[in-house]
């Protein structure tokens, strides 16, 4: 009653201020979305938006996909747009390329990109080169997507990173998402693109939740292909990575920050075309460069970044040679302890950063 009496005696503006102080709304919890859910959401929105879009691959329909990325899509869109295929990558990739040439927009899922080797002729010779060979008359709007790179306990034939393989080929666009925001924005941009786009996902990231910004929750949200993102600002060293190693780089940056070393972490997002301008701008600021990737060292993504920096204006700003952190130059072992030592770890990134900083 005392509170009521006070309210009665005070002017309205003071009463409303008092109420705001006494009664406040709890801020809404951030929307947590896994990478798997983000890809699913992106495909769902594009399937709904454009009836020319369809998904095909092994077990993508009734089984909801080997990694459940296509969960619920078959029930929503039916057999004509969510299509289970035989175990023949050469066959269904060829069907998808032909459909793209005929004006549809197929999403061709490889259960793992290691199996895309069975369809390399369709991806490279048929999809990537047709626009050029037709003098720009025949576009091939197709998406090749699926898990890429090292997983857990699947050994040499199921653990390769194809970023450098496909990034080498003119006519392809190649993206490699890390977060849920990356995954949704890049898959939607890939589906809308009139060129063949390779989307290199990561099996170990599918179940990892990220906070999805409000703008990324929009059905109109797109991430431009060919544009990197600075995930963390820094002044002492530039670290460039894509896919799962981005998280390792951020962990390393957190550790080194306690020692007074501030790292700028760049999430590459797109392998081809590469956003070299963002990397150059960062290197000109930090004067040091470390690249991190899960693939093999020879002719890799890091090697290309280092070459481009050496050939461009940022080279004169380097105070030390660039350093690469890569997977080991061996086929992926099966034993866990050997597997762990074959892919970059946080400690390897920290060692490389201290090496280039000479500390």
Swiss-Prot record:
Record carries keyword Transit peptide: yes
Gene Ontology cellular component terms for the protein in this record: mitochondrial matrix; nucleoplasm; pyruvate dehydrogenase complex
Residues given in the record as K(+) binding sites: 142, 190-191, 193, 195
CDD domains xref list: TPP_PYR_E1-PDHc-beta_like
Major localization class: mitochondrion
One MF annotation (Gene Ontology) recorded for this entry: pyruvate dehydrogenase (acetyl-transferring) activity
Gene3D superfamilies: 3.40.50.920, 3.40.50.970
Catalytic reactions on record: N(6)-[(R)-lipoyl]-L-lysyl-[protein] + pyruvate + H(+) = N(6)-[(R)-S(8)-acetyldihydrolipoyl]-L-lysyl-[protein] + CO2
Cellular location(s): Mitochondrion matrix
Pfam families for this protein: Transket_pyr, Transketolase_C
Phosphotyrosine modifications at: 67
EC number annotated for this UniProt entry: 1.2.4.1
Annotated site, Important for interaction with DLAT, chain positions: 319
Transit peptide: 1-30
Keywords: Acetylation, Carbohydrate metabolism, Glucose metabolism, Metal-binding, Mitochondrion, Oxidoreductase, Phosphoprotein, Potassium, Pyruvate, Thiamine pyrophosphate, Transit peptide, Tricarboxylic acid cycle
Cofactor: thiamine diphosphate
Record note on quaternary structure: Heterotetramer of two PDHA1 and two PDHB subunits. The heterotetramer interacts with DLAT, and is part of the multimeric pyruvate dehydrogenase complex that contains multiple copies of pyruvate dehydrogenase (E1), dihydrolipoamide acetyltransferase (DLAT, E2) and lipoamide dehydrogenase (DLD, E3). These subunits are bound to an inner core composed of about 48 DLAT and 12 PDHX molecules. Interacts with DLAT.
Protein purpose: The pyruvate dehydrogenase complex catalyzes the overall conversion of pyruvate to acetyl-CoA and CO(2), and thereby links the glycolytic pathway to the tricarboxylic cycle.
Protein name: Pyruvate dehydrogenase E1 component subunit beta, mitochondrial
Protein's organism: Bos taurus (Bovine)
